Every structure is written in C-alpha cells, then in structure tokens.
UniProtKB/Swiss-Prot annotation:
The gene is HAK23. Residues 1-126, 195-260, 317-325, 401-406, 463-498, 546-555, 605-877 are cytoplasmic. Belongs to the HAK/KUP transporter (TC 2.A.72.3) family. Residues 12-28 have a biased composition (Pro residues). It is a multi-pass membrane protein. One of its GO terms (molecular function) is potassium ion transmembrane transporter activity. Residues 1-60, 72-92 are annotated as: Disordered. This is Potassium transporter 23. It is found in: Membrane. Residues 148-173, 282-295, 347-379, 428-441, 520-524, 579-583 are extracellular. One of its GO terms (cellular component) is membrane.
Length: 877
C-alpha cells in the first residue's frame, strides 16, 4: 500500500523507512518582544529558551520582519531570491530594539493585531493606461484650476513693479516665469514630492502622519505597537543610510523640542492653506471680472467690486450642495480653458513676435536683475503667482493617482502655460503699455466674450478647488486632534472626500467679501497672495527632506541637494513677498497666525487632558477588590463608557460607581482613536479584550480610524454590530479555551481579536459601509483570532462543553433587551494653581473658550438624548 501510494515500482531493495514525525507544535504562545537582557519573551511573560529560535525571519526581499506565525514557523531564517544568511540573534535583537523601542508594560492590545490579515502590506492594483488618461483629464478640473488661471494676473502684477523700458524687461520676466514653472511644479512636485505620499494621500498632514508612523513624534501619547500592523511595516537590512535614519529617528523621539518644531511646521503649513482658501477666490474672481473694464462703457472699479462680491456670494452659497452636483463640468471647462490658452498663445506668437522664444536662454534673467536692480527683486512677488496652486498637485493626490497628475501636467498644463505666457510676451513686444489688462487685451476681439465666460467659470472652479482643500485640511486637523470639533456634512454618498463645513464656508465668504471690498485691486491682493503660497511650499520642502532622511534613506548628498536647490529658490521668493507686508502682505500672516494659535492651543490642551486622564486612571486591582458586583447593584443593560484611554480604566468609571445607584450588567469601554494613516481597513478597525474575570462582564473596545476615514453610523446599526461582534468574541474565546484544554497547553492568555470581514470586498470610499461591515455577522463571515489558524469548533459542541458560554450569552441577551446607555464625561479642564501665568491663560481662557464653543461630543454619536448620561468632571493639568 505504501509503495502504491508513493508511486514507487517494484525494486529489489526495501523502501527506506519513513522519516520520523515532526515534533508537535509548541503551545499556543506568541513572541512579543525582547527582554532587557537581550533575550526574547513570549506573550505570557516566559523567557525564550536557548533551544527556541529568535522571533526573526529573513525573507526574499532582504528585509527583516517580526514573525507573527507560531513558534513552529518562527525558527531559523529562510533565504529567498535575494540571498543572504541569517542574522545572529544578538544583532537582530539589538537592531530591533533600536528601531522601535518596546513599551515598558505588556498590554494585550499591543499584541492583538499581530495576526490581522494584510498586516504586512496591501497589494496595489495596476491602473490601466486608459484609466490613467481618464483620471488625468479629471485632474484638470480639480488640481490645476488655480495654476491655470494665473495668466490672468501674473504679467500685470510683475510689470506694475518693473516698468517696461526695453525688451530686456519682457524677456527677463518671461524667462523667470518659465524657469519658475519648470523648477517648482515640474521638477520638485511632479518628480519628487508626489512620491512622498502616504498610501496615495498627499498634503501636509499626510507627510506628518507618514513621519509619525516611522518615529513616535506625536505629542499625544496614545501610540501602540499594535498600530504598526495596520499597514506594512518592514525593517530593512542594516546599511549606512538606515543607521543614519535610525539616528534621526532617535533624535526626534528623544527631544521634545524637535517634536514641537515639527508640529509647528505642519500646523503653519495647514494655516497657510486655509489662508489660500481665503485669498484664491478673491484673486481669481476679481481678475476674471476686471476684464470687463475697458470693454463695457462705464464699468469702473466700483462695478468690478460689486460684481465680484455677487459672484463670491453665489459661489459660497452653492457649497452646501456639494461639488459632486456640478463636478462633471469642471474638467471639460478647464480643458477648454487650457486649449484657449494654447491657441491664443500660438496666435499671438505668430502675429506679433515669435522671437520671444529667446527667453529660454536664462541669461535674460541675469540681464533683468542687472538692469532693474531692487525693482527686479520686488517683481519676484508677482512672478511667484505663476505657480499658485502647485501645492494642490500634492494635496489633492488622494482623489487621483501619481501617474495621472504627472501625465496631465506634462502633456497639457505645462506646455499650454508656457505658450500662453510667451504669447502675452509677444503681444507686449508690440504694445508695451498694455500691461494693466494684458490677458484680455491679447485676446482677439472676436473671441473676447467666449473667453470672458470661460475665464469666469475657470476662476470659480479654481476657487472651488481651494475651498474644498480648506475643508479637507480642517477635517484632517480635527482627526489628528489639532482643531476643535465643528460640524461636517458629507455631500456625496460615494466620494468620501466631498465634504461641506458650514462654519468655515460662511467664514471664508465673509473674509473674501471684506478683502475684495477693502483692497479693490488685484495687484494689492497679489501682494498678500504670494506669502501664503511660498509658505506652504517651504513647509513641504522641510517635511520631504525629513522623509528622505528617515523613510526613503536617500544618499546624503542627494538629500542635501533637495533643500539647497529648491529651498534656496523658495527662500528668495519668500524674501520678495515679505517685503510687501505693509502693502497687504500682513493679511495672510494674520489669518495664518490666527488659525495656528487655534490649532496649537487645541492640540496643547488635548495632550494635557489626555495626560491628566492617564494619571487618574483606575487600577485593575481596585476593580477586582470590588468583586463582580463592582460594589453596587448590577441591572440588565449595556453601558458604553466613552473615553480616550487606550489602556487602563478611565477615571470617569469611578465617578459612575460613586454617582449612580446601580451599574449595567455589561460594561464596554469604547475608545475612538485616530491613527496616523489615511484609512484603516474595516477588518482591522476593532480591537477587543476582556477586563477582569468572566463574571465581571467588562470589555474594552478600541475603534481605530484614519485621518480621512468617515464616521457616519447611526447608533442603532452601530449597537447591532457591536453586540454581534461581542458575541463572536465570546464564542471565539470559549473556542480558544476548548482548543487549549484539548492540547494540554500552558496557562492560557485570555486575549483575543475578532476581525469580521465581509465576504464581498468593501470599498473605502462608500459611506454606507459601517464600522465593521455592511452585512450581518453570520455563517458567511470569516473570523480570526490571535493564535494563528486554529481550527473552528462548531458552536453547538462548544456550548455543550462550556455552560459558562451559554450563561454569558444569555446575560448578554438580557442586557440587549434592556437597551444601551451612553456614558460620557462632561469635563472642565483647568490649569493647576502652581502653573505659570501663560499656561493658565492658554488653558483657563483660550482653550476653555474653544471647548465651550466647539461642537459637543454627543452630537457626533447621533444618539437620542434619553440614552445619554453625562458625568461632570474637572481635569487639573
């Protein structure tokens, strides 16, 4: 039979004896961390013996990773296509300890996600060429509106500072514009900055979250090792670049000054983007409307201001309907606009003076500065307007792909803008005094009205892009704890990024009206416009440089070239625009300072409040001493205790025990936590653990969200999912106990994770998807627990062998029938008496003012007021 089974024919020699059976797998234990003495430790606290392998493996791409398999698969190192021998246990342990320091205390939530499906990366789908072209067409209407409308006002602002005396001024200004576009948007953003994306997300906060994942630089101390397993987290083999990256990482983590500087840069960049949201609509709309001057008799400055204000009111009034209602028109209008720019530019080149192509010679930049001196330096403030909106290429990356943005800029935007500016320069070579309205004067008479209509629509679309970017920045800042809670309305059921913030919308409208009515001139607004743009670019340069050092591990020479080349150019432009502070440049600085103070104060107060909660948390021993009744009467019902702690029992629970005459039979501590990733997959969102013994009926639930995730769940559906998940948790816990008992395992670690994954793929952009899934948890749902791929026992057999499970499930059903109660803290944050005056002023007045006027936390839960119970607390920070 053995010969037949193995397919061996008759041979004179007897078959070799079968190999000895492999040793049985070790007990269900998991490797967690390295001990202080250099050894390894299991989750249950026992040391790894000398015969057990270190928790490392070397895979084919020559990268180190922490093994999440059972001990049977964790031993040794396996070589791959990349070759290379196994690392020694001592060197790998020291390297791991240096890359990511372990928490002092082993908490179950630090281990639970080690078996999360997809923890080591998510496969990226290749986008077809047709899809890339279609996406590139869409970027014209969303990304490039601001930059595309810059020909309306660039030359008029430049030559308002440098009068045209000869062709040197025209060719020099044209050469400056051409090389500025080629250097900043084309070289910096298209080829470098776009690659520094956070899983396809761009913007200042995306860079910050990317840095926070590789170094613990967030000031809010709620980071956990478990968060590293949300997305791919790999350690490369030791190299000089990696050693340098580790040194940078350690410096950032150890020095609180560096953390504050990094946060300050991020908040300043975000504040500048909000400033752009105020200045862009004012500048774009007023530039488009000013084309009627000289064409319509009696249409003077007052008429321009009034019509611009009417357009602005209309623009902000339709925001509540969402960009999706008119978004399909954006790309065709902007495509038509770029075609007009290129066509009119070619017409002017052919008709007036094609010799302006000499501006490709950068020597005219030198002649421009040599001839005009300080005036030429002042003209840089107008020249920088040609790259307004360049940051949108990176900020709006989440809606498109890197390749689509690169294709659109390289194939359409870049050539059309160059031709448009050359056409205007050719017109000025013949009519040097037509600088005030150079764009409309260079348009052929027969095309004026069609071009005016398209220009006005393009200006409003450009304004829409910056308004939407402002809304997105506010939402991201709120998610990362850097902005007070305000109302956010999702205007699309399919597109997650389409949001509307009423308070910010009307604030922007009022500010835009004030700016137009006060400045009354595009040249004066341009003085303020440039500061915000250059400020955002310099912040992105600093953050991308840090990404190169810490994450990309680029060669040091190339790293230094990036800030030296681009940073020096941006610094020169910054000095030019800062010289216009008295002429209107103070405006963006005032707006940025206001929002910077708001965001930094909110973050500062939130960090102090969290630290105060950590100091006041209740010990588990105290809860155990109270017994299963918790020192009070347990009545049927489920109490959801909302708190911000990821570990420990919050102090609000102690207040509840003292204040309430009875306590719910089932207690779930719910922590809503935002992690520095754009999206958390639904199957990785929830972490569960049991607190105390079974008869306590107390659980912890940590719900993790990315800074671009949407929380839009009705309380009834959320409660249903929570209960079903809790039931799954209890069954898997019982199953785990049965398996360990049958395997004669060592003392069981009572930690489990339930990941409920829908049988059909879930799209992150669908707002109908709730916290876990949009399906009832049933037979078609896969479940995973921490102890690897353990076999699943039938529910019936488990319930027969474990009566305590049926008792606990019956108690849960009784609690469900009695209903849910949401228990929240209504806290007052006060500075301690011994604090400095500045801290008292910030916390007791400014932060308290923001807390009183921000949106209440209960408003985001969408729970009937009859189901909410709030307990007053005072946090001394």
């Amino acid at each position: 039979m053995d010969d037949d089974d193995s397919g061996i024919q008759e041979e004179p020699a007897p078959p070799p004896p079968p190999p000895p059976p492999p040793p049985p797998p070790p007990p269900l234990r998991r490797l967690l961390t390295a001990t202080r003495s250099g050894g390894s430790r299991w989750v249950d606290g026992s040391e790894v013996g000398s015969s057990e392998s270190a928790p490392w493996s070397l895979d084919g791409d020559r990268s180190l990773r922490l093994s999440v398999d059972s001990a049977a698969s964790a031993g040794g190192a396996s070589g791959g296509g990349g070759g290379g021998g196994p690392l020694s246990r001592a060197s790998s342990g020291a390297f791991r300890r240096r890359f990511g320091k372990q928490p002092r205390r082993v908490d179950s939530l630090d281990v639970e996600a080690m078996s999360v499906r997809g923890a080591h990366g998510h496969s990226s789908k290749e986008i077809s060429m047709l899809s890339t072209v279609a996406m590139a067409f869409q970027t014209l209407g969303v990304v490039y509106g601001d930059m595309g409308t810059s020909p309306l006002y660039v030359f008029s602002d430049v030559f308002s500072k440098v009068p045209i005396k000869s062709e040197v001024e025209i060719l020099g200004a044209l050469s400056l514009v051409m090389y500025t576009i080629a250097l900043i948007p084309f070289a910096k953003y298209v080829f470098i900055v776009l690659k520094a994306n956070d899983n396809g997300e761009g913007g200042t906060f995306a860079l910050y979250s990317l840095i926070c994942r590789y170094a613990k630089v967030s000031l809010l101390p709620n980071q956990q090792r478990v968060d590293e397993d949300i997305s791919s987290f790999r350690l490369k083999l030791p190299t000089p670049e990696l050693e340098r990256a580790l040194s940078v990482k350690e410096s950032l983590e150890k020095n609180p000054v560096f953390k504050n500087i990094l946060l300050f840069l991020v908040l300043m960049g975000t504040s500048m983007v909000i400033g752009d949201g105020i200045l862009t609509p004012s500048m774009s709309v007023m530039s488009a409307v000013s084309g009627l001057q000289g064409r319509v008799p009696g249409f003077g400055t007052d008429a321009v201001v009034i019509v611009s204000i009417l357009f602005l009111v209309l623009l902000f009034s339709v925001q509540r309907f969402g960009t999706g209602k008119v978004g399909f028109m954006f790309a065709p209008i902007l495509a038509l606009w770029f075609i007009n720019l290129g066509t009119i530019g070619i017409y002017n080149l052919a008709k007036y003076d094609i010799s302006v192509v000499r501006a490709f010679n950068p020597v005219y930049i030198y002649l421009f500065f040599q001839t005009n001196g300080i005036k030429a330096w002042s003209a840089l403030g107008g020249c920088v307007l040609c790259i307004t909106g360049a940051e949108a290429m990176f900020a709006d990356l989440g809606h498109f792909s890197v390749k689509s943005i690169q294709v659109a800029f390289t194939a359409v935007v870049f050539p059309c803008l160059l031709i448009a500016y050359m056409g205007q320069a050719a017109y000025l070579m013949k009519y040097p005094f037509a600088v005030e309205r150079i764009f409309y004067d260079s348009v052929p008479e027969i095309l004026f009205w069609p071009v005016f209509v398209i220009a006005t629509l393009a200006a409003m679309i450009a304004s829409q892009a910056m308004i939407s970017a402002t809304f997105s920045c506010i939402k991201q800042a709120m998610a990362l704890g850097c902005f007070p809670r305000i109302k956010i309305i999702h205007t699309s059921k399919k597109v997650m990024g389409q949001i509307y913030i009423p308070v910010m919308n009307w604030f922007l409208m009022v500010m835009c009206i004030i700016i137009v009515a006060t400045f009354r001139s595009t040249n004066d607004i341009a003085n303020a416009y440039g500061i915000a743009e250059v400020g955002v670019m310099m912040v992105s340069t600093a953050l991308v440089t840090l990404v190169m050092l810490l994450i990309w591990q680029t060669n040091l020479f190339l790293v230094m070239c990036f800030p030296v080349i681009f940073g020096s150019v941006e610094f020169v432009y910054l000095t030019a625009v800062l010289s216009k502070i008295q002429e209107g440049g103070w405006l963006p600085l005032a707006f940025s300072s206001l929002f910077l103070c708001i965001m930094y104060t909110w973050n500062y107060g939130s960090v102090l409040k969290y630290q105060s909660e950590m100091r006041g948390k209740i010990s588990l021993d105290f809860i155990l001493d109270l017994g299963s009744t918790l020192g009070t009467v347990r009545v049927p019902g489920i109490g959801l205790v909302y708190n911000e702690l990821v570990q420990g029992i919050p102090s609000i629970f102690g207040h509840l025990l003292v204040t309430l005459p009875a306590m719910h039979s089932t207690i779930v501590f719910v922590c809503i936590k935002y992690v520095p990733v754009p999206y958390v997959p639904f199957e990785e969102r929830f972490l569960f653990r049991r607190i105390g013994q079974k008869d306590y009926h107390m659980f912890r639930c940590v719900a993790r969200y990315g800074y671009k995730d949407v929380r839009k769940e009705e309380h009834g559906f959320f409660e249903q999912l929570l209960v079903e998940t809790l039931e799954k948790f209890l069954r898997k816990e019982s199953q785990e106990m049965a398996l360990e008992a049958s395997a004669m395992a060592v003392e069981r670690d009572d930690v489990s994770v339930v990941s409920d994954i829908p049988s059909s793929p879930v799209e992150a952009g669908d707002l109908h998807v709730p916290l876990l899934s949009d399906q009832r948890l049933g037979d078609g749902t896969q479940t995973f627990i921490t102890e690897g791929n353990t076999p699943v026992l039938p529910t019936s057999s488990i319930s027969e062998e474990d009566p305590s499970l049926e008792y606990e499930l019956e108690s849960l059903r009784e609690a469900i029938a009695s209903g849910f109660t949401y228990l929240l803290a209504h806290g007052d944050v006060r500075a301690r008496k011994e604090s400095f005056f500045t801290k008292k002023f910030i916390i007791n007045y400014f932060y308290a003012f923001l807390r009183r006027n921000c949106r209440a936390g209960t408003a985001t839960l969408k729970v009937p007021h009859s189901n909410i119970m709030r307990v007053g607390m005072t946090y001394m920070v």
